[in-house]
Amino acid sequence: MPTPTKGPRLGGGPAHEKLILANLATALFEHRSITTTEAKAKRLRPHAEKLISFAKKGDLASRRQVMKTIRDKSVVHFLFTEIGPAMAERNGGYTRIVKIGPRKGDNAPMAVIQLVMEPVSAKQGVVREAERAAAVSAPAADEVVVGDEAPAAESTDAAQVEAGGVEQPDTLPDADAPATADEGVEVDAAEVDPSDEKKDQA
């Protein structure tokens, strides 16, 4: 017994499903964007991306594989000459599905499936590198958290001082220390002054 495909079953049987997907892919490559139900769009996406991968290869065997699915030679030509080279820099993700409102008649969920024809920018590579760097620096962020815990300990000491649990000295040693050092330097300079020594001798 053959294994059924993943996702919803389209049409009456397997042959009908293949025809539906082939027609949807043909319309997608011809118009670059089509509106269909969400279920059909989700089933079409891997099928269309596989055909685009064949178009990126561009050899005769790939063209024959695509011709098995898409019977319109003009669409195959457009796929191999326009769409395939435009997707050369992109590694997957050739299509995009955008959900739109439900259909008026039967309230079926609708979606627009379209080809992603925008060129791959250098910014996308930079964003990927930044994400990798952020993942690598995640352990470094843990070290920063340890540094943040120290001010919290200092704040608890300040709270104890305010509560009267710890005695606080009357003078600040940092404020007095530079003044004492300056006075000591002046005193040493006065003691070494040779004019004072001559006056003392006379």
From Swiss-Prot:
Keywords: Ribonucleoprotein, Ribosomal protein
Stretches with biased composition (Low complexity): 169-182
Tree of life domain: Bacteria
Protein name, per record: Large ribosomal subunit protein bL17
Family of the protein in this entry: Belongs to the bacterial ribosomal protein bL17 family.
Gene: rplQ
Gene Ontology cellular-component annotations: cytosolic large ribosomal subunit
Keyword DNA repair found: no
GO molecular function, one term: structural constituent of ribosome
Disulphides: none
A single GO BP: translation
